[in-house]
Amino acid sequence: TNSDSFAIDLKKWLSIMQTYENGGHAYHATMPTDALRAFRDTVLETREYGYEKLKLAQWELGDKVRKYLAGKGIKSVAAEGFTAPGVVVSYTQDSEIQNGSKFAAKGMQIAAGVPLACDEPEDFKTFRLGLFGLDKLYNVEATFKRLTMVLDQVL
C-alpha cells in the first residue's frame, strides 16, 4: 500500500534503514528511534498492567477531579456526557490560573487555557489539567491527593 503519513510511512523507514545498511546516509525528519522504543516499552507496560484496569482508573481519576472542581464552584467546559477521562478543561477568571503560573509556583505544570475558536469573548479564560501517565493511574488516590493539595492552594 501507499502511505499518506509522513511520520509512520514504513516504506520510507525501510528505505532509510536499507540506505544505512548499505553504508549510506539518509535523512527523514521523523520521531527518533529512542522515542519509538520508549513508546513500545510503554505499550508493553500498559498491556501488562491491563488495558481495562487502566481505563477504569483513568475514568475514576477524571471523574474525581471534575467532581472536586465542581464542588469548588469551578465549571467544566465539557457538558455532562461529553467529558474526557484524561483531560479536564475548566473556566476561570484568573489570568494566573489560565496561564498556569499559579500552579508553577506550587511546583505543578498544567496546560494553559484552551481557546474554543467559536467567537468567544476576548476575556475568555480556561485552564487544562492533563491527567495522563501510567504513574498517575497506578495510584489514583495518591494522584488525586497530590493534585488537590495544589488546587486547594491555587483556587
What do the predicted segments below correspond to?
Residues 1-67, 71, 135:
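Active-site C-terminal subdomain of aminotransferase-like
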Residues 143-151:
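Short amphipathic C-terminal alpha-helix that caps PH/PH-like domains
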Residues 47, 151-155:
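Short, hydrophobic alpha-helical segments
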